[in-house]
Amino acid sequence: MKQHDHALVSGEFAKHWAREPWPPGSTLYAIAQHDVAWQGPDASVRWNEEAGRPYSFLDYPSEPKLAAYTAGLDLLETEDSYAACLCSMHYETLVHGSQGEAERRFGETEVSRQRRIKTVLSEEEIGSLDRNLRFLKLCDGLSLFVCLNEPGQKGYPPPYPEGFVLDGQEFEPIWEDDRTLRLDPDPFSGPFGISLPYQTIGRDGRPLGDGRIELRVT
């Protein structure tokens, strides 16, 4: 599965969210586009010889991954400053505390980006960033749950092993059957569909086949 396709599914969860405060348009855009940086890396497969599979977002080599992150955030900043700041904060938290030099430099650069963007945001927008970052991460986690779990599996995906919480409320994903998922409690405006394309990749990086996961969220 391509990371950008996963992010678009995150955007579907966000778009159908029905609990106040309503996410503004720039937040919805940020959530749907938060992995636009992966379009370059996902265009060609890098094979992890040690693991015997393609690299995932968890073990992809740092230097090209961080370069892609930077390019993606640069693109977002030309389109929507608030969305770029939100995605920058998201990526910066992913490398926070890392001992790697490349990760440290990336984190410092993104903190500087955030400071720069905040100079053109309103006080209200700045005040909403932390909460909307938590909302982005919730929707990211819900999409990863769908991408990484077979129907019926209950494990929470990295980097959210402790579950899905927003504003003190925990949301539990429950499989009704192998094509239907619901959250308890239900935060959505109504049922909606999710369509997620995927490819099977051979060791030489060539696609062996493709398919599509079709789910109903109720």
Language-model features: locations:
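Short linear motifs at secondary-structure transitions and domain/linker junctions
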Residues: 3-9, 156-161
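Active-site nucleophile-adjacent alpha helix/oxyanion-hole segment immediately C-terminal to the catalytic cysteine
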Residues: 17
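Divalent metal-dependent catalytic cores for phosphoryl transfer on phosphate-bearing substrates
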Residues: 1, 8-12, 20, 24-149
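Non-catalytic terminal regions of proteins
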Residues: 107-218
